[in-house]
């Protein structure tokens, strides 16, 4: 296995298309990552460093290293091997390259918790450091009541160009413990506003005395081969409540508002991501009908 000889901070046009074709092939086989046939790669591949692995001129693997690190200070990596070239040791070689390049304490994602990833982690001495659960609910048969708000609190939808700062402020307070979500910036929100999936009508804000105290940002995923029967899927993307405003069922009310909105769009399935050790959130979502569907794992030393 060879590559372009070095880690790169940017991919040239040809490398970008080569990586896109590889990721599309991976998506066809595994259902992820969510990469489009044209345009920019998904946001998780922005910045950082890239390594493209080739055999006889054919791209067989790709690794990305987020050198900035998450809010806990861990550099985070992703690696992919083309489905037609698996079980030939390329994943191990990419992981070795990451191990040599990344800072001590780096983490690497294994989406879907595939047996091959578990085997590779065990072989190389990596341990499970984090589990991110994908929960799922069928809309048909769900009976989600109208949200009930405590006195003085009202709901409205997000206004682009007006509410970014307030959302980021609440998000930072609500997720100061979270390695990725807590790092959300105004620039990140504005970047998502430019994405095709963004829908301000599905972005709910809770206000009290004119101040935003919580939000529920929903998302709709276009059909992805190999996942959810090839249907469009709604997502409880982010629910954040200012710690000073917690209590009185505000988080539940915001969640219900988003679920009812997604159901009104004719979606038959809704998902969400939750940390595997967040027992309180798991209890809330279980009561709303969600069950475990998939698990993403971060490995590290």
UniProtKB/Swiss-Prot annotation:
Organism phylogeny: Bacteria, Bacillati, Actinomycetota, Actinomycetes, Pseudonocardiales
GO BP annotations listed: mycothiol biosynthetic process
Keywords: Acyltransferase, Repeat, Transferase
Subunit composition and interactions: Monomer.
InterPro entries in the record: Acyl_CoA_acyltransferase (IPR016181), GNAT_dom (IPR000182), MshD_Acetyltransferase (IPR050276), Mycothiol_AcTrfase (IPR017813)
Residues binding 1D-myo-inositol 2-(L-cysteinylamino)-2-deoxy-alpha-D-glucopyranoside: 180, 219, 235, 273
Organism of derivation: Amycolatopsis mediterranei (strain U-32)
Known function: Catalyzes the transfer of acetyl from acetyl-CoA to desacetylmycothiol (Cys-GlcN-Ins) to form mycothiol.
Catalytic activity: 1D-myo-inositol 2-(L-cysteinylamino)-2-deoxy-alpha-D-glucopyranoside + acetyl-CoA = mycothiol + CoA + H(+)
Tagged with keyword Aminoacyl-tRNA synthetase: no
Entry EC no(s): 2.3.1.189
SUPFAM superfamilies the UniProt entry points to: Acyl-CoA N-acyltransferases (Nat) (SSF55729)
Homology family: Belongs to the acetyltransferase family. MshD subfamily.
Sequence ranges assigned to domain N-acetyltransferase in this UniProt record: 6-151, 153-301
Name this polypeptide is given: Mycothiol acetyltransferase
Keyword Acyltransferase: yes
Binding site for acetyl-CoA 2: 239-241, 246-252
């Amino acid at each position: 296995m060879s590559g372009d000889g070095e880690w790169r901070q940017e991919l040239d046009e040809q490398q970008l298309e080569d990586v896109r074709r590889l990721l599309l092939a991976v998506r066809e086989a595994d259902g992820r990552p969510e990469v489009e046939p044209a345009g920019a790669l998904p946001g998780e591949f922005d910045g950082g460093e890239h390594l493209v692995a080739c055999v006889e001129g054919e791209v067989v693997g790709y690794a990305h290293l987020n050198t900035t690190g998450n809010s806990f200070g861990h550099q985070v990596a992703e690696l992919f091997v083309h489905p037609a070239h698996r079980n030939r040791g390329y994943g191990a070689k990419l992981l070795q390259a990451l191990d040599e390049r990344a800072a001590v304490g780096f983490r690497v994602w294994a989406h879907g918790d595939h047996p091959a990833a578990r085997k590779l982690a065990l072989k190389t001495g990596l341990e499970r450091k984090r589990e991110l659960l994908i929960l799922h609910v069928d809309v048909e048969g769900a009976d989600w009541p109208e949200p009930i708000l405590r006195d003085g609190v009202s709901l409205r939808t997000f206004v682009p160009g007006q509410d970014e700062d307030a959302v980021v402020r609440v998000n930072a307070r609500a997720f100061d413990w979270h390695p990725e979500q807590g790092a959300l910036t105004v620039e990140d929100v504005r970047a998502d506003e430019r994405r095709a999936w963004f829908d301000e009508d599905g972005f709910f804000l809770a206000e009290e005395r004119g101040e935003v105290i919580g939000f529920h940002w929903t998302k709709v995923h276009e059909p992805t081969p190999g996942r959810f029967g090839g249907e469009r899927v709604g997502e409880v993307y982010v629910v954040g409540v200012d710690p000073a405003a917690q209590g009185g069922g505000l988080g539940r009310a915001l969640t219900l508002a988003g679920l009812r909105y997604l159901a009104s769009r004719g979606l038959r399935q809704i998902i969400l991501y939750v940390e595997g050790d967040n027992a309180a959130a798991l209890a809330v979502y279980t009561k709303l009908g969600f069950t475990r569907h998939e698990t993403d794992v971060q490995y590290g030393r």
